[in-house]
Amino acid sequence: MAVEDTPKSVVTEEAKPNSIENPIDRYHEEGDDAEEGEIAGGEGDGNVDESSKSGVPESHPLEHSWTFWFDNPAVKSKQTSWGSSLRPVFTFSTVEEFWSLYNNMKHPSKLAHGADFYCFKHIIEPKWEDPICANGGKWTMTFPKEKSDKSWLYTLLALIGEQFDHGDEICGAVVNIRGKQERISIWTKNASNEAAQVSIGKQWKEFLDYNNSIGFIIHEDAKKLDRNAKNAYTA
């Protein structure tokens, strides 16, 4: 697990890694009875694995490594160019590393107004200028503060658990802390691939049980038109 300079506004002061023994499994089937941070376990087959015998927890690699990024509003307000205050925080590549980080980070409802918190595939920077993001766009959902933490967690689990049929199209996700509502967006690579984008939008809504219509805005349109950019697709 790679650890960068860690903004104190993201990570709690006393971060203690938690030992997680089971992989992410069918998180969205657990319903509201599952505690935040709980990982679903499968039925045992009665066998004792070698990692249990040795006393060393088994590691469960993810298909991709992911990096958390943070844009600090206190620093951002003093910068002249967009993105100059954006910093990588941690990179993780296993289920155990993810939960250790997530359980010791501040969740969206506790972040300062104006903050932006990202989780992107490793080596992809959460910027329009990144060559992998340049031709893409984003789906966006809005949530009241009391629902933002769970929605952010379920979005992260869907990403790192490779739940999307067109997961290769996904760059990452961001939660924007704004006023009474939070925005969560999923960034994708190729905006012209309509079938893939619409599939991602529909599946995301299913995973989060989100009933409102959502829109997909192409990055190029957002750069040119800002808030006047129109949805290219809806789901």
UniProtKB/Swiss-Prot annotation:
PROSITE patterns: IF4E. GO terms for cellular component: cytoplasm; cytoplasmic stress granule; cytosol; nucleolus; nucleus; P-body. InterPro entries: TIF_eIF4e-like (IPR023398), TIF_eIF_4E (IPR001040), TIF_eIF_4E_CS (IPR019770). One of its GO terms (biological process) is response to virus. According to the redox status, the Cys-133-Cys-171 disulfide bridge may have a role in regulating protein function by affecting its ability to bind capped mRNA. Gene3D superfamilies: RNA Cap, Translation Initiation Factor Eif4e. Changing residue 81 to D: Normal bolting time and increased resistance to potyviruses such as clover yellow vein virus (ClYVV), watermelon mosaic virus (WMV) and turnip mosaic virus (TuMV, including resistance-breaking strains TuMV-E116Q and TuMV-N163Y). Residues 1-59 are annotated as: Disordered. Residues 1-16 have a biased composition (Basic and acidic residues). Signal peptide: none annotated. Disruption phenotype: Delayed bolting. Increased resistance to potyviruses such as clover yellow vein virus (ClYVV) and turnip mosaic virus (TuMV). Residues 60-63, 70-106, 154-163 are annotated as: EIF4G-binding. It comes from the Eukaryota. MRNA binds at residues 78-83, 110, 128-129, 178-183, 223-227. The keyword Plastid does not apply. Belongs to the eukaryotic initiation factor 4E family. This is Eukaryotic translation initiation factor 4E-1. It comes from Arabidopsis thaliana (Mouse-ear cress). The lineage of its organism: Eukaryota, Viridiplantae, Streptophyta, Embryophyta, Tracheophyta. The gene is EIF4E1.
